[in-house]
Regions:
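Conserved active-site-proximal phosphate/metal-binding subdomains
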Residues: 16, 166-210, 216-351
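Active-site entrance/lid segments in N-terminal catalytic domains of soluble metabolic enzymes
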Residues: 1-202
Length: 351
């Protein structure tokens, strides 16, 4: 596998560990991935959930935790690889999270769950902090590249193209996710590889394309590399590692899951998502969960209307209440059978 070049950086292992929140990919996991020569990604979604005072002031705790986890991940990495963050566009404090991450020294900022149309405006030093949108179609890629070109006279440092087999929030309709054979993801990747060429030529840069969603093993990696992409983003497989920041019970839920345990859900974020069908999912499919408190996490969320509080559901899960929490997962979770380490997993993937 060739190294991944992003701006001035050369990343020895062309693997990005996908951001997973709440609290699944923090400094322990991201730092370990970077130490192996890849790109470790911290999710900023309610990142401060374990900080003292979180129940009273989520915003302040999240900003403090962003700084803390980036510093700790870089310390673990020991100068290897890159440390980045994933910031969801849907977050109420999106701008503050991006600025805090850049100021704390995040090497890359990856942004999805909506189009990050204003992301370039939030980066003071584009030579220091590299940015990438997450897109799921050539149409979305063309739109964001055109917007950044027109409004900010710059382009993306790389593109993360997420297919329909990914976990968490997905840029596809529920109907598409229930009829996967009708989605030509390879075709979308090929179109994106063509559409980025105009902006590469205009700005005299290379825009690497990273394939994400359902990448499980070296066979999957070879398939997308043969299409012409520059690297892959993998998330679910990193959950069943010793270094993952989730509770042991959360990791065991992944290991014990079968393909038939997967559900397509509607998230309060306003997007469909892929998650484990546990007692929590079965309950909220039938009746609205009582919401006792709003954690002010999303720009567009009406507690009176949404079926459950996504912050509470995700925090319950990461802390180990795997029956009553929300467990996002990729489509290949049923193939995960045992715990491993980040070192061994990456050696397997690149071997």
């Amino acid at each position: 596998m060739n190294s991944l070049k992003i701006g001035k950086w050369e990343v020895p292992v062309p693997i990005i560990q996908g951001g997973m929140g709440v609290g699944i990919s923090l400094s322990s996991l991201a730092g370990a991935v970077a130490r192996e020569g890849g790109i470790g990604v911290i999710s900023t979604a309610q990142i401060g959930y374990a900080e003292e005072g979180f129940e009273k002031d989520q915003a302040a705790c999240n900003l403090r935790a962003i700084r803390k986890h980036i510093a700790r991940a870089k310390e673990i990495a020991g100068g290897n690889g890159l440390v980045g963050v994933n910031v969801m566009v849907a977050l109420k404090h999106y701008e503050e999270h991006v600025r805090a991450a850049a100021a704390a020294g995040a090497d890359v900022i990856i942004s999805g769950a909506g189009l990050p149309s204003d992301l370039p405006a939030l980066i003071d030093d584009p030579d220091r902090t590299k940015i990438a949108p997450i897109v799921s179609s050539a149409r979305a890629a063309q739109l964001i590249l055109k917007m950044w070109d027109h409004h900010y006279h710059r382009t993306a440092d790389f593109l993360v193209v997420e297919g329909p087999l990914a976990g968490g929030h997905l840029g596809f309709t529920r109907e598409q996710l229930e009829h996967l054979d009708d989605v030509n993801f390879d075709g979308e990747l090929s179109k994106i590889l063509v559409c980025k060429e105009f902006y590469e030529e205009k700005y005299g840069v290379s825009i690497p394309v990273i394939a994400a969603g359902g990448v499980f093993d070296r066979t999957d990696i070879n398939h997308v590399l043969d299409l012409g992409v520059d690297g892959v983003q993998i998330a679910s497989r990193f959950v069943a590692t010793e270094e993952c920041d989730a509770s042991p019970a959360y990791k065991q839920a992944y290991i014990q899951a079968k393909e038939e345990d997967i559900a397509i859900i509607q998230s309060p974020v306003g997007m469909p998502g892929r998650a484990l069908r546990n007692a929590f999912i079965r309950r909220v499919e039938k009746t609205k969960d009582p919401i006792c408190k709003c954690y002010n996490c999303l720009k567009k969320c009406n507690p009176a209307e949404v079926p459950y509080c996504i912050t509470k559901a995700l925090i319950d899960a990461v802390q180990g209440d795997v029956d009553n929490g929300l467990i996002f997962c990729g489509a290949n979770i049923g193939r995960i059978r045992e715990m491993t380490t980040v070192h061994d997993l990456i050696r397997e993937l690149i071997g």
